[in-house]
Amino acid sequence: MRTEIEIPDEVTATMDHLEVTVEGPNGSVTRRLWYPDITVDVEDGAVVIETDDDNAKTRSTVGTFESHVTNMFHGVTEGWEYSMEVFYSHFPMQVSVEGGDIVIENFLGEKAPRKTPVRGDTSVEVDGEELTVSGPSIEDVGQTAADIEQLTRVSDKDTRVFQDGVYITETPDRGDV
């Protein structure tokens, strides 16, 4: 089984041992792709994934690797973006980016600020009560958005009443990726 993924024009892909590095206008993404009896290589303007095995697990792993590579191409060309929104009813919370951390102050009237790190090459922009999380790596962008959402999770309270928090309102469109 052999699968070829064509490298877009403005993108370069290199293979270093087991790691694929993809560079483009939005940055670079590196990912380790390894599975027994599957080889990944860059040949003639394409990323080639091939194997001699024909069992279900190997075929599904080849498909997974293909998805990872196409997500990397999409990330370095168009990028990935999550939209988030701040909701509060009584205590106005302030969200800011300080260094490599997202800081949420005055959540439910708390005195101590809540912090979470920004992962990888992800950028977070705060515009009033709207946040935009974007970057070239879908894993880093998604995990940063999830970390922000979990940072304001309210435990031991009825979430129908205590709806304060920062929530993901729009996820990336994975249409033809």
Swiss-Prot record:
Gene3D superfamilies: Ribosomal protein L6, alpha-beta domain. GO terms for molecular function: rRNA binding; structural constituent of ribosome. Keywords: Ribonucleoprotein, Ribosomal protein, RNA-binding, rRNA-binding. It comes from the Archaea. The keyword Ligase does not apply. One of its GO terms (cellular component) is cytosolic large ribosomal subunit. GO terms for biological process: cytoplasmic translation. The keyword RNA-binding applies. HAMAP family: Ribosomal_uL6_A. NCBIfam families: PRK05518.1, uL6_arch. Part of the 50S ribosomal subunit. Belongs to the universal ribosomal protein uL6 family. This protein binds to the 23S rRNA, and is important in its secondary structure. It is located near the subunit interface in the base of the L7/L12 stalk, and near the tRNA binding site of the peptidyltransferase center. This is Large ribosomal subunit protein uL6. The gene is rpl6.
